[in-house]
């Protein structure tokens, strides 16, 4: 048997040849009779049963089984084949024909869409059963059998049965089995539904909806009518009357789950739809009004279009079944806005049920809401059902009304538009702060003015707290000799100029020697607050007072120790290797510009030369010229870089003077006596063959009215070490910067040429005290300031004490002021001891009360040699 089965499965063609005698039909009948002597008349052989047992094992059978499981049509066809196998073989032959037909032919053979419509299907269903059946006869209905007979899906039969169940024409016995009642209880059921409809005030709802539609067409803003409370009092959370299926006495369904089935909504909707016809005065109900009442107007707004269309489709299904029962018929209502689909009641006239047997009406009990879960209540009560009653409408409304409503909505919402409000707020907020790109110059000017005003207020506070400067007797400059010093390099590189702050806000411009690659720097201060002068006590000669600032202490105290030095220029070769000089201050008309030209020799040569008697006389004349002159102190302020000049020995062009004196190549540093110490190293000077670095102190006298006309010094670079000249800055840029910073007045013009200073406007000159600045520690000597402050260690191991002098008391300058220059030289020489110098009070009685007295610290020069 196993071998036969293998042959049967593996070689079906051999099996066919063995069992099919038609292959020998070409031979004579005699031969056929010999081969098959016992066979009757020739017929088509039927499919053996063994093949059906072996089908699931073949790929074709498996594919057919999968297709039948997936496709409902094939599954239904297989079921029909199994049902009608015993009756006749015609359905099987018909199915075989459909299998061999193509797709288009198969669709043509199927019933059309009209034939499958619910109305036609309902007519066929009702034709199977009588309107008034005999109760003694079994009137059970099997839905599966009906679906097979009508050749439709079972779900289509369910739609018909649900509507008939709502009218109590059928009752449910079990799953897929119903009992047919016919029209025996139809009038009674309709009377019950009419009474319930009157209790729910469906007539008022229909009138209210029609009235609201009429008002919305002509007046959009008008709200709901006064009858809204009628609906709200009778509506549930779904927006329409919430009630269960209406049952009649004696016709209660025997199924326990009758009111909990999923298809309950269709039955309830069908009963409500019939109620609308029964309670309306003209028994014509449009589909739009029925949808608003049955589905709920708010649900029409909340639901999306797909769900709403599904609900409308359910209403059409109910209407088709009722039309098949000859209860309603489809008509069209013509109104102002066009033609609408509607249905007219054609059934029997029903009066409200007044019989003694009251119908069993199952409304939603109050305890049903209690049993409802809190989550469901929260989901239903989260949003109000009638929040926006006038905005969204049914899609079937006319476009004209929608356009009018949209226009009115735009007009009403225009004044309170959030976009316009934001723009207004942004414009108000941005009013005090305009665009920076459009108002950049004005903003910069405002910021500069605010900074200058703040600095002026700080200066006033500091001036109020400052005390008088203690006078110290000036040093008597030696007559016979001046020392020449060679300065070693300090820690700070050349060009790094730390600005030591000062209580005052005005300053004399300062130019420091720079490296060949870097520009010079000029320090400018606001001239508006430079009118501060002090009067020294009578009997003391005018000197220079330096002030130590607290901000300059700390990490830079060790580098702030400098020495005052002066020497005569004795060698032209050494002079050519030293940096250029600064421009002196502008002088008054009739006064001469006197300059002293210190000079030094290269190497470690230390020699002192006697000063001639003429220089001593000139110095005494300078001291006499200081009488009746009040000086003004200028601290350091702004550090402004200036390019270096490309030539040595530049001449100073003084404003208002034709004669100008030639300056030595040595650097002369202008500084304020209140500005403290500004150290400058000479390491870079040594790299460019600077044997020594000499500083000559100057005393400048400038009139108070022309404080803004402060001199600008030119610091020429060495042509030998820096062959490529650097261009000077534009004078327009310098003037613009200083004017906007408030450092100079608008009528003052600065010149950035190598040999010129500024052009003073006012002819009056104010006296300016310029303190000598020290460029570095001397080679072999250190200058110590006498002070009670303990000395701080220097990088070279020497102890240097820093003295902080008090600020002078400001007074008003008196009388006319003269221009004079005073030169203070470091006392002592290479052979003198450390404490050889003392204070000299000679010529003190020659100083008048109007002269500014600025005492100078006592200096001690050590004789230690540093190799």
UniProtKB/Swiss-Prot annotation:
The modification Phosphoserine is found at residues 71, 102, 413, 417. Its main location: nucleus. Residues 38-58, 408-432, 532-616, 771-800 are annotated as: Disordered. Keywords: Activator, Cell cycle, DNA-binding, Nucleus, Phosphoprotein, Repressor, Transcription, Transcription regulation. GO terms for biological process: cell cycle comprising mitosis without cytokinesis; chorionic trophoblast cell differentiation; fibroblast proliferation; hepatocyte differentiation; negative regulation of cytokinesis; negative regulation of transcription by RNA polymerase II; placenta development; positive regulation of DNA endoreduplication. The keyword Electron transport does not apply. It comes from the Eukaryota. Homodimer and heterodimer: mainly forms homodimers and, to a lesser extent, heterodimers with E2F8. Dimerization is important for DNA-binding. Interacts with HIF1A. This is Transcription factor E2F8. It comes from Homo sapiens. The gene is E2F8.
């Amino acid at each position: 048997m196993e071998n036969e089965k293998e042959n049967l499965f593996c070689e079906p063609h051999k099996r066919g040849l063995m069992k099919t005698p038609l292959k020998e039909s070409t031979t004579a009948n005699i031969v056929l009779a010999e081969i098959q002597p016992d066979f009757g008349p020739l017929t088509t052989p039927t499919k053996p049963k063994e093949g059906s047992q072996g089908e699931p094992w073949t790929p074709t059978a498996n594919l057919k089984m999968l297709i039948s499981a997936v496709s409902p049509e094939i599954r239904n066809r297989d079921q029909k084949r199994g049902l009608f196998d015993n009756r006749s073989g015609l359905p099987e032959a018909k199915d075989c024909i459909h299998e061999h037909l193509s797709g288009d032919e198969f669709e043509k053979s199927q019933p059309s869409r009209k034939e499958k419509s619910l109305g036609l299907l309902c007519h066929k269903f009702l034709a199977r059963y009588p309107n008034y059946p005999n109760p003694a006869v079994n009137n059970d209905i099997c839905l599966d059998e009906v679906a097979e007979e009508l050749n439709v899906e079972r779900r289509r039969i369910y739609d018909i049965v649900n509507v008939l169940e709502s009218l109590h024409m059928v009752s449910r016995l079990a799953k897929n089995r119903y009992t047919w009642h016919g029209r025996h209880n139809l009038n009674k059921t309709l009377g019950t539904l009419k009474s319930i409809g009157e209790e729910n005030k469906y007539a008022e709802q229909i009138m209210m909806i029609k009235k609201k539609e009429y008002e919305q067409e002509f007046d959009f803003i008008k709200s709901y009518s006064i009858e809204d409370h009628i609906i709200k009092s009778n509506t549930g959370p779904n927006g329409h009357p919430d009630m269960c299926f209406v049952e009649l006495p004696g016709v209660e369904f025997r199924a326990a789950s009758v009111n909990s089935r999923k298809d309950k909504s269709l039955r309830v909707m069908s009963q409500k739809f019939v109620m609308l016809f029964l309670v309306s005065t003209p028994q014509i109900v449009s589909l739009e009004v029925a949808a608003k009442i049955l589905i709920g107007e708010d649900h029409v707004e909340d639901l999306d279009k797909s769900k709403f269309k599904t609900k409308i489709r359910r209403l059409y299904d109910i209407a088709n079944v009722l039309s098949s029962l000859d209860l309603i018929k489809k008509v069209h209502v013509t109104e102002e806005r066009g033609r609408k689909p509607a249905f007219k009641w054609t059934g029997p006239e029903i009066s409200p049920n007044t019989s003694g047997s009251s119908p069993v009406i199952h409304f939603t009990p109050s305890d049903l809401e209690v049993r409802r879960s809190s989550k469901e209540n929260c989901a239903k009560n989260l949003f109000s059902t009638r929040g926006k009653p006038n905005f969204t409408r049914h899609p079937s409304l006319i476009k004209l009304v929608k356009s009018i409503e949209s226009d009115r909505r735009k007009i009403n919402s225009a004044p309170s538009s959030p976009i316009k409000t934001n723009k207004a707020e942004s414009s108000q907020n941005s009013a005090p702060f305009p665009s920076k790109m459009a108002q950049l110059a004005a903003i910069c000017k405002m910021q500069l003015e605010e900074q200058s005003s703040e600095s002026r207020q700080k200066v006033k506070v500091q001036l109020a707290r400052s005390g008088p400067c203690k006078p110290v007797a000036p040093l008597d400059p030696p007559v016979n000799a001046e020392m020449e010093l060679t300065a070693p390099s300090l820690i700070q590189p050349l060009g790094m100029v730390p600005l030591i702050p000062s209580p005052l806000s005005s300053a004399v411009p300062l130019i420091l020697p720079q490296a060949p690659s870097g520009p010079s720097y000029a320090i400018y201060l606001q001239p508006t607050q430079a009118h501060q002068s002090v009067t020294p006590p009578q009997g003391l000669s005018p000197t220079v007072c330096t002030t130590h600032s607290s901000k300059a202490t700390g990490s830079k105290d060790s580098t702030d120790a400098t020495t005052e030095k002066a020497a005569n220029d004795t060698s032209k070769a050494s002079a050519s290797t030293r940096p250029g000089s600064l421009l002196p201050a502008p002088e008054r008309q009739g006064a001469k510009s006197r300059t002293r030209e210190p000079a030094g020799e290269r190497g470690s040569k230390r020699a002192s030369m006697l000063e001639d008697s003429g220089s001593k006389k000139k110095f005494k004349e300078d001291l006499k010229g200081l009488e009746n002159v009040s000086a003004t102190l200028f601290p350091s302020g702004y550090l402004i870089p200036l390019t270096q000049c490309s030539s040595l020995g530049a001449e100073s062009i003084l404003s208002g003077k034709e004669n100008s004196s030639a300056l030595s190549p040595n650097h002369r540093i202008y500084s304020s006596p209140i500005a403290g110490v500004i150290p400058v190293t000479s390491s870079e000077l040594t790299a460019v063959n600077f044997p020594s670095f000499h500083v000559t102190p100057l005393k400048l006298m400038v009139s108070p009215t022309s404080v803004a006309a402060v001199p600008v010094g030119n610091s020429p670079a060495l042509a030998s070490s820096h062959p490529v000249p650097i261009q000077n800055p534009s004078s327009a840029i310098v003037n613009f910067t200083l004017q906007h910073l408030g450092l100079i007045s608008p009528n003052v013009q600065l010149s950035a040429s190598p040999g010129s200073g500024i052009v003073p406007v006012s002819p009056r000159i104010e006296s300016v005290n310029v303190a000598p600045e020290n460029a570095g520690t001397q080679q072999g000597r250190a200058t110590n300031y006498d002070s009670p402050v303990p000395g701080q260690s220097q990088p070279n191991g020497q102890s240097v004490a820093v003295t902080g002098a008090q600020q002078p008391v400001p007074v008003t300058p008196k009388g006319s002021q003269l221009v004079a220059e005073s030169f203070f030289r470091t006392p002592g020489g290479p052979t003198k001891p450390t404490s050889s110098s003392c204070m000299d009070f000679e010529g003190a009685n020659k100083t008048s009360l109007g002269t500014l007295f600025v005492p100078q610290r006592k200096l001690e020069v050590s004789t230690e040699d540093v190799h």
